[in-house]
Amino acid sequence: MRRTSSIRDERIAVILRKTLDILKKHNMDADIIEYPRGERRSVDIVVNKRIIIKIGRDASEISREEIEDLKLASKMLDSAAVIISETYLNEDLEPGVVMDRSDISVMDPETLDLYLSNEKVAIYYKRGHFFVKINGVALHRKRIERMLSLGELAEMIGTSRKAVYEYEREAMDPSIETAQKLIELFGEEIVSRIDLHELTERYVYGYVNKILKIHAQEDPMLRKMYEMGIEAVKLKRTAPDIVGRIEDQKTALVIQRDRGDDNEMVEKIVNTIKICAKLGCEIYAVLSNRGIDREAKKKLEDNVTFVEREKLEHLLKNLVRR
């Protein structure tokens, strides 16, 4: 078992390095997140283009808790979420095709390279079906040039008038079979490229919006923040304990545990700084009565606001008033 785990860790390290090399090649500023150490974590890399990356050897091996964390973080920090792995269900991922794990986009390093090169990575898999990303403006123009009504085109490709209307609005995309019929009629010009941010917003953000109130009802701290007008979620597998937002103002809270040690608290803060430097959020470290080492605190004060736990509610009220 230990040998298997070691091999998996080695493969993950290779994928991580490949991913970082690709990001560097495309002049993207990225940071590795290293908390929690030696345990499963939901965030491995953050990128300044508002992208959160989880690395896995096989996308199916990533736990539900990590997936949930990744979804919550992406919504609260207004970022695209993507899993980079080599395989899914022990099958090699196909270059140029974006797969899906619980509504999060999955791709191999080669597809990430193509995507960042502005190549037409157009095929993606969601909820049991393959789709092709269509350029709605080009489709509309081609249809008008051919003097076809929405209904006429719908009949030609075997779909509904409403579906064609949604393709042109880019509110939905056709299946591979339907896309092939459109390409035969109008050419490759109507094919576009996926946008990781759009896919995350379309498939992940709606889910998070639905569960925000449920989470707030179950947790006293989140309920208090919700009543103040702060959308917030608790994260379990990464550095910040809570991330929240008031309109476009994003906030990360790192909360000191009564029985935790200073080193762990500092490590959480340092990794939260990395996340927020790339994704744009203010950081508040909430201290228990134990406090934190004076020297460590001094080194972090330029990037973090420290607040005593009993003053947290006052701080949150001030954030809402701003």
Region spans (language model):
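Conserved hydrophobic/aromatic packing and binding residues within compact polymer-binding modules
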Residues: 139, 153-154, 164-167
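The alpha-helix within a helix-turn-helix
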Residues: 143, 154, 183
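Conserved catalytic cores of phosphodiester-cleaving nucleases, focusing on short active-site segments
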Residues: 16, 21-24, 30, 41-82, ...
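Recognition helix of helix-turn-helix/homeodomain-like DNA-binding domains
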Residues: 158-173
